[in-house]
Amino acid sequence: MIQLAQNAKHPSKKEQKPLVNEQIAFNQFTLIDENSTNLGIVKMENALKLAQEKQLDLVLIAPNPTKPIVKLLDFGRYTYDLKRKKRQAKKNQTIIQTKEVVVKPTIAKHDLEFRAKQSKNWIEKGHHVKFIVRAFGRVSTRIELIEKVFDDFYQLVKDVVEIQKPLTASSKTMYAALLVPLKR
Protein backbone atom coordinates (compact mmCIF):
# COMPACT_ATOMS: atom_id res chain seq x y z
CA MET A 1 0.00 0.00 0.00
CA ILE A 2 1.33 3.45 -0.93
CA GLN A 3 1.02 6.21 1.61
CA LEU A 4 0.95 9.80 0.48
CA ALA A 5 3.25 12.13 2.37
CA GLN A 6 1.77 15.34 3.65
CA ASN A 7 2.90 18.45 1.87
CA ALA A 8 5.85 19.75 3.90
CA LYS A 9 5.25 23.37 2.87
CA HIS A 10 1.59 23.37 3.85
CA PRO A 11 0.99 21.07 6.81
CA SER A 12 -2.65 20.59 7.74
CA LYS A 13 -3.71 23.41 10.01
CA LYS A 14 -6.70 22.21 11.95
CA GLU A 15 -8.07 25.14 13.88
CA GLN A 16 -8.56 24.20 17.48
CA LYS A 17 -11.96 25.41 18.64
CA PRO A 18 -12.53 26.30 22.28
CA LEU A 19 -14.37 23.77 24.43
CA VAL A 20 -18.09 24.47 24.82
CA ASN A 21 -20.72 23.36 27.39
CA GLU A 22 -20.43 19.59 28.07
CA GLN A 23 -17.03 19.40 26.35
CA ILE A 24 -15.47 21.23 29.31
CA ALA A 25 -13.76 18.59 31.47
CA PHE A 26 -13.41 20.63 34.67
CA ASN A 27 -15.79 20.05 37.62
CA GLN A 28 -15.48 23.61 38.88
CA PHE A 29 -14.08 26.78 37.40
CA THR A 30 -14.19 30.56 37.57
CA LEU A 31 -17.30 31.76 35.74
CA ILE A 32 -17.61 35.12 34.03
CA ASP A 33 -21.05 36.18 32.80
CA GLU A 34 -21.99 37.97 29.55
CA ASN A 35 -21.42 41.39 31.18
CA SER A 36 -17.83 40.42 32.18
CA THR A 37 -18.78 40.14 35.85
CA ASN A 38 -16.87 37.52 37.83
CA LEU A 39 -19.38 35.11 39.41
CA GLY A 40 -16.67 33.27 41.35
CA ILE A 41 -15.90 29.56 41.40
CA VAL A 42 -18.95 27.60 40.18
CA LYS A 43 -19.63 23.87 39.78
CA MET A 44 -20.23 22.50 36.29
CA GLU A 45 -23.89 21.51 36.92
CA ASN A 46 -24.83 24.95 38.24
CA ALA A 47 -23.07 26.69 35.35
CA LEU A 48 -24.88 24.53 32.77
CA LYS A 49 -28.25 25.33 34.38
CA LEU A 50 -27.43 29.04 34.35
CA ALA A 51 -26.39 28.84 30.70
CA GLN A 52 -29.64 27.10 29.73
CA GLU A 53 -31.71 29.68 31.62
CA LYS A 54 -30.01 32.57 29.83
CA GLN A 55 -29.89 30.66 26.48
CA LEU A 56 -26.12 31.13 26.28
CA ASP A 57 -23.12 28.81 26.07
CA LEU A 58 -20.25 28.06 28.42
CA VAL A 59 -16.95 28.66 26.60
CA LEU A 60 -13.57 27.72 28.07
CA ILE A 61 -11.49 30.88 27.71
CA ALA A 62 -8.39 29.94 29.75
CA PRO A 63 -7.77 26.17 30.01
CA ASN A 64 -5.37 26.58 32.94
CA PRO A 65 -5.45 23.29 34.95
CA THR A 66 -5.29 25.06 38.32
CA LYS A 67 -7.65 27.98 37.61
CA PRO A 68 -9.76 27.39 34.48
CA ILE A 69 -11.82 30.37 33.34
CA VAL A 70 -15.15 29.86 31.59
CA LYS A 71 -17.25 32.63 30.09
CA LEU A 72 -21.00 32.70 29.57
CA LEU A 73 -21.68 33.95 26.03
CA ASP A 74 -23.31 33.27 22.66
CA PHE A 75 -20.86 30.87 20.99
CA GLY A 76 -22.01 31.64 17.43
CA ARG A 77 -21.45 35.35 17.93
CA TYR A 78 -18.12 34.64 19.65
CA THR A 79 -16.76 32.60 16.71
CA TYR A 80 -18.06 35.20 14.24
CA ASP A 81 -16.23 37.98 16.13
CA LEU A 82 -13.00 35.92 16.23
CA LYS A 83 -13.12 35.33 12.47
CA ARG A 84 -13.86 38.99 11.81
CA LYS A 85 -10.91 40.09 13.97
CA LYS A 86 -8.62 37.63 12.19
CA ARG A 87 -9.78 38.89 8.77
CA GLN A 88 -9.28 42.51 9.84
CA ALA A 89 -5.78 41.78 11.16
CA LYS A 90 -4.88 40.07 7.89
CA LYS A 91 -6.20 43.02 5.89
CA ASN A 92 -4.17 45.50 7.96
CA GLN A 93 -0.92 43.56 7.47
CA THR A 94 1.70 45.27 5.37
CA ILE A 95 4.15 43.15 3.45
CA ILE A 96 7.56 44.69 2.87
CA GLN A 97 9.37 43.35 -0.15
CA THR A 98 13.07 43.67 -0.81
CA LYS A 99 13.80 44.65 -4.38
CA GLU A 100 17.26 44.15 -5.84
CA VAL A 101 19.31 46.44 -8.05
CA VAL A 102 22.26 44.55 -9.55
CA VAL A 103 24.97 46.55 -11.33
CA LYS A 104 28.55 46.18 -12.53
CA PRO A 105 31.28 48.59 -11.41
CA THR A 106 31.58 49.80 -15.00
CA ILE A 107 27.92 50.85 -15.32
CA ALA A 108 27.22 53.94 -17.42
CA LYS A 109 25.97 57.10 -15.72
CA HIS A 110 22.59 57.07 -17.49
CA ASP A 111 21.99 53.43 -16.58
CA LEU A 112 22.77 54.18 -12.94
CA GLU A 113 20.36 57.15 -13.01
CA PHE A 114 17.65 54.90 -14.45
CA ARG A 115 18.21 52.32 -11.68
CA ALA A 116 18.09 55.12 -9.10
CA LYS A 117 14.76 56.38 -10.48
CA GLN A 118 13.39 52.84 -10.39
CA SER A 119 14.62 52.43 -6.81
CA LYS A 120 12.98 55.69 -5.74
CA ASN A 121 9.63 54.38 -7.00
CA TRP A 122 10.09 51.18 -4.99
CA ILE A 123 11.12 53.10 -1.88
CA GLU A 124 8.07 55.39 -2.16
CA LYS A 125 5.88 52.27 -2.22
CA GLY A 126 7.52 51.20 1.05
CA HIS A 127 9.82 48.46 -0.28
CA HIS A 128 13.43 47.98 0.75
CA VAL A 129 16.14 48.07 -1.92
CA LYS A 130 19.18 45.82 -1.90
CA PHE A 131 21.93 47.40 -3.99
CA ILE A 132 24.32 44.76 -5.35
CA VAL A 133 27.57 45.35 -7.22
CA ARG A 134 28.87 42.31 -9.07
CA ALA A 135 32.53 42.56 -10.01
CA PHE A 136 34.27 39.83 -12.00
CA GLY A 137 37.92 39.33 -12.90
CA ARG A 138 40.43 42.06 -12.13
CA VAL A 139 37.69 44.58 -11.43
CA SER A 140 36.80 42.70 -8.22
CA THR A 141 40.13 43.83 -6.71
CA ARG A 142 39.39 47.52 -7.38
CA ILE A 143 37.32 48.25 -4.31
CA GLU A 144 37.52 52.02 -4.80
CA LEU A 145 35.63 51.62 -8.11
CA ILE A 146 32.95 49.51 -6.43
CA GLU A 147 32.56 52.05 -3.61
CA LYS A 148 32.37 54.90 -6.14
CA VAL A 149 29.47 53.20 -7.94
CA PHE A 150 27.63 52.80 -4.64
CA ASP A 151 28.35 56.41 -3.60
CA ASP A 152 27.09 57.71 -6.97
CA PHE A 153 23.92 55.63 -6.60
CA TYR A 154 23.41 56.79 -3.00
CA GLN A 155 23.82 60.45 -4.00
CA LEU A 156 20.95 59.99 -6.48
CA VAL A 157 18.55 58.45 -3.93
CA LYS A 158 19.70 59.92 -0.59
CA ASP A 159 16.65 62.21 -0.29
CA VAL A 160 14.28 59.21 0.12
CA VAL A 161 16.47 56.46 1.65
CA GLU A 162 18.73 55.71 4.55
CA ILE A 163 21.38 53.01 4.69
CA GLN A 164 20.34 50.17 6.95
CA LYS A 165 23.27 47.92 6.07
CA PRO A 166 26.36 49.55 4.53
CA LEU A 167 28.15 48.20 1.47
CA THR A 168 29.93 45.00 2.47
CA ALA A 169 31.43 42.07 0.61
CA SER A 170 28.97 39.18 0.56
CA SER A 171 31.33 37.07 -1.57
CA LYS A 172 34.56 37.49 -3.56
CA THR A 173 32.71 39.00 -6.49
CA MET A 174 29.64 40.55 -4.87
CA TYR A 175 29.12 43.59 -2.64
CA ALA A 176 25.72 44.48 -1.19
CA ALA A 177 24.02 47.28 0.76
CA LEU A 178 20.47 47.51 2.08
CA LEU A 179 18.56 50.77 1.71
CA VAL A 180 15.27 51.49 3.49
CA PRO A 181 12.75 54.36 3.29
CA LEU A 182 13.42 57.42 5.44
CA LYS A 183 11.41 57.54 8.65
CA ARG A 184 9.20 60.60 8.54
Curated annotation (Swiss-Prot):
Keyword Transmembrane helix: no
GO cellular component: cytosol
Keywords noted in UniProt: Cytoplasm, Initiation factor, Protein biosynthesis
Cell location: Cytoplasm
Gene Ontology biological process: ribosome disassembly
InterPro entries: T_IF-3_C_sf, T_IF-3_N_sf, Translation_initiation_fac3_CS, Translation_initiation_fac_3, Translation_initiation_fac_3_C, Translation_initiation_fac_3_N
Record flagged with keyword Magnesium: no
GO molecular function: ribosome binding; translation initiation factor activity
HAMAP family: IF_3
Family statement drawn from the similarity comment of this UniProt entry: Belongs to the IF-3 family.
Function of the molecule: IF-3 binds to the 30S ribosomal subunit and shifts the equilibrium between 70S ribosomes and their 50S and 30S subunits in favor of the free subunits, thus enhancing the availability of 30S subunits on which protein synthesis initiation begins.
Known partners and oligomeric status: Monomer.
Name of the protein: Translation initiation factor IF-3
Biological source species: Mycoplasma genitalium (strain ATCC 33530 / DSM 19775 / NCTC 10195 / G37) (Mycoplasmoides genitalium)
